[in-house]
């Protein structure tokens, strides 16, 4: 017999015969939710319900509605789609089919050029396969059998994947009817758990993301635990399409990106205003919270990157140039540079903590296929800071940072923030004592503030644990922006130290921290969160004054000067155009406040006020209108 324990919903234990299946354990220990369980965590490892459990351990259920459960049924859907495509187009060769956020895709090599016109037939075939409710069966195969099987099918992409599996590592396949795919799993017990699905788009994708390889056909889809959840997702995607920051910014003339500078932003005047407002806002917050702003070089010698470890682990993502037979790398991050400032003189423990911030321009050689507007770029500015401190100071610094972070998110209109703690990975540097203390120094501030957080087991970096802060936008999408990362390794590698109270050298802890992540991406998030109607304090034009006729142009100019003297960003449209046309143009440009000025308004030194999103016009004295305007543009 073996003993199985669980902490869900309360700590309980049960005895089972050796080699009991996950399905039997689920039925016995979680009878009320057994029908919705698609897999189990066994001692922290995810496995399907058919796999036997042969020793004492702990289990936790994975239900179909959970994030992990949804990931599993999307993996199921990817296999079902691959099977359907092959049944419709027998010459199809299969590449890879992973899950992605809210969906899945599969890469195909076939003679037929797939288009969205094929989706109906593929979806119909998928529905037929699901209706059969065949089981997903996991099998472990000897390497030779797997190679022969895929050779006989001519599946050269699978053979290439097999060739990269280390000798001695278990090779698993999943069978579904007569369909067999190379796969680690896990999968749900059978196809019926894929309750609702839809194919969404098709694109080209190079095999393994390498432009030297063949271009494959990638079909995307989404799958959900219910038709209602699918309908809600489709509605949100349609709403997201309307909010696409690339389209909105193009309409408003805020920025553009072109092929001659892939992944780098051409900021237009109004977009650059938004950028600078955000930068200056963060700068003021940093000063208030005790940070010192620095500026470091963009290119540094290869030797520094070798010392920091980035050359070994990050070189393929770095832009490298040669100068006088030296290799220089354009920096992909700021941290090694900040260490250089720290170690530029002897530091005392009395100086710590040192909070060093930079709006650092960084570059990363991201694959061209992954670039996406402002959300994924090659050239970007991090609102980056590094705190050099002692182990004893970490807790208070994390507490201070969280308070700053929440101030910022609230001002930008984000009230829903989730927190995740990524703790020690299996491969790590440092003693268990250091990791215990470090994890506690991240958890204690959250506990003290009553902040709920989830734990990403084993997902910390090898050099320290981290907290991640994720925003939820107005249509429910999540964006990971803020980070607190402890680092025991970099200061040691780069020779940073301070003189302690004992007169000896000590290595500081570095806290890597960011609030926005990158300014570019955060602006993209803001545009989509507000559908382009960003708050007045951020708007590049806060007030537009429209003249009804040329007779009031001088009065309108006086109004513009009055507003400008109060640091309002104002534009005057005194063109000889129809006033209705001017109003429509101001609405299209999403100007928060519009003052309309005609003979009547000029006669009594007033204005007619229109707010964006409201069709109503309010007549008031110019002085009162300005006071109301100043209140509006100062609100955060």
Swiss-Prot record:
Its cofactor is Zn(2+). SMART domains: tRNA_SAD (SM00863). It holds the Pfam family tRNA-synt_2b. One of its GO terms (biological process) is threonyl-tRNA aminoacylation. It is an enzyme of class 6 (ligase). It catalyses: tRNA(Thr) + L-threonine + ATP = L-threonyl-tRNA(Thr) + AMP + diphosphate + H(+). Gene3D superfamilies: 3.10.20.30, 3.30.54.20, Anticodon-binding domain (3.40.50.800), Bira Bifunctional Protein, Domain 2 (3.30.930.10), Threonyl-trna Synthetase, Chain A, domain 2 (3.30.980.10). It is found in: Cytoplasm. Catalyzes the attachment of threonine to tRNA(Thr) in a two-step reaction: L-threonine is first activated by ATP to form Thr-AMP and then transferred to the acceptor end of tRNA(Thr). Also edits incorrectly charged L-seryl-tRNA(Thr). Keywords: Aminoacyl-tRNA synthetase, ATP-binding, Cytoplasm, Ligase, Metal-binding, Nucleotide-binding, Protein biosynthesis, RNA-binding, tRNA-binding, Zinc. This is Threonine--tRNA ligase. Its EC number is 6.1.1.3. Zn(2+) binds at residues 335, 386, 512. It comes from Anaplasma marginale (strain St. Maries). HAMAP family: Thr_tRNA_synth. Binds 1 zinc ion per subunit. It comes from the Bacteria. One of its GO terms (cellular component) is cytoplasm. Belongs to the class-II aminoacyl-tRNA synthetase family. Homodimer. The keyword Kinase does not apply. Residues 244-535 are annotated as: Catalytic. GO terms for molecular function: ATP binding; metal ion binding; threonine-tRNA ligase activity; tRNA binding.
């Amino acid at each position: 017999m073996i003993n199985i324990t669980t902490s869900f919903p309360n700590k309980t234990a049960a005895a089972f015969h050796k080699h009991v299946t996950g399905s039997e354990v689920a039925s016995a220990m979680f009878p009320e939710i057994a029908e919705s369980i698609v897999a189990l965590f066994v001692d922290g490892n995810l496995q399907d319900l058919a796999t036997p459990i042969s020793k004492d351990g702990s289990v936790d259920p994975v239900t179909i509605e959970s994030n992990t459960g949804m990931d599993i049924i999307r993996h199921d859907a990817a296999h079902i789609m691959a099977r359907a495509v092959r049944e419709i187009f027998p010459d199809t060769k299969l590449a890879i089919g992973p899950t992605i956020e809210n969906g899945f895709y599969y890469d195909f090599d076939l003679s037929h050029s797939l288009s969205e016109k094929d989706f109906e037939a593929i979806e119909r075939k998928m529905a037929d396969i699901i209706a059969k409710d065949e089981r997903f069966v996991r099998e472990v195969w000897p390497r030779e059998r797997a190679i022969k099987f895929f050779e006989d099918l001519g599946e050269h992409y699978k053979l290439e994947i097999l060739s990269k599996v280390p000798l001695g590592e278990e090779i698993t396949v999943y069978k579904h009817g007569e369909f067999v795919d190379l796969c680690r799993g896990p999968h749900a017990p059978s196809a019926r758990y894929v309750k609702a699905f839809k194919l969404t788009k098709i694109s080209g994708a190079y095999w393994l993301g390498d432009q030297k390889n063949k271009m494959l056909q990638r079909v995307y889809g989404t799958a959900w635990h219910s038709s209602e959840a699918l309908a809600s997702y489709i509605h949100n995607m349609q709403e997201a399409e309307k909010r696409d920051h690339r389209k909105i910014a193009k309409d408003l003339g805020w920025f553009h990106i072109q092929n001659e500078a892939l992944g780098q932003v051409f900021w237009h005047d109004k977009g650059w205003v938004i950028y600078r407002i955000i930068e200056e806002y963060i700068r003021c917050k940093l000063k208030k919270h005790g940070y010192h702003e620095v500026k470091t070089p963009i290119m540094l010698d290869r030797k520094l990157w070798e010392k920091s470890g980035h050359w070994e682990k990050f070189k393929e993502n770095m832009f490298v140039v040669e100068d006088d037979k030296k290799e220089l790398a354009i920096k992909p991050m700021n941290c090694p540079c900040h260490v250089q400032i720290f170690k530029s003189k002897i530091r005392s423990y009395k100086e710590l903590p040192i909070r060093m911030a930079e709006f650092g321009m960084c570059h990363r050689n991201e694959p061209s296929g992954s670039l996406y507007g402002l959300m994924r770029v090659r050239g970007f500015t991090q609102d980056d800071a590094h705190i050099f401190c002692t182990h004893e100071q970490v807790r208070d610094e994390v507490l201070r940072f969280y308070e700053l972070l929440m101030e910022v998110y609230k001002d930008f209109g984000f009230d829903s923030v989730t927190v995740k703690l990524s703790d020690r990975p299996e491969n790590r540097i440092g003693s268990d004592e250091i990791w215990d203390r470090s994890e506690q120094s991240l958890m204690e501030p959250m506990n003290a503030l009553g902040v709920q957080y989830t734990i990403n087991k084993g997902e910390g970096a090898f050099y320290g644990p981290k907290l991640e802060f994720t925003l939820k936008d107005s249509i429910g999408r999540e964006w990971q922006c803020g980070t607190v990362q402890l680092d025991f390794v970099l200061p040691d590698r780069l020779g940073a130290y301070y003189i302690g109270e004992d007169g000896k050298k000590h290595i500081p802890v570095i806290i890597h921290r960011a609030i926005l992540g990158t300014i570019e991406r955060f602006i993209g998030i803001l545009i989509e969160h507000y559908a382009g109607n960003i708050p007045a304090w951020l708007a590049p034009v806060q007030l537009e004054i429209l003249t009804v006729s040329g007779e009031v142009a001088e009065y309108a100019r006086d109004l513009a000067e009055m507003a400008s003297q109060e640091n309002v960003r104002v534009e005057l449209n005194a063109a000889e155009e129809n006033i209705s046309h001017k109003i429509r143009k101001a609405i299209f440009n999403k100007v928060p406040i519009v003052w309309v000025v005609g003979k009547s308004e000029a006669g009594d030194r007033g204005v007619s006020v229109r707010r964006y999103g409201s069709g109503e016009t309010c007549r008031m004295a110019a002085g009162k209108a300005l006071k109301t305007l100043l209140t509006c543009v100062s609100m955060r």
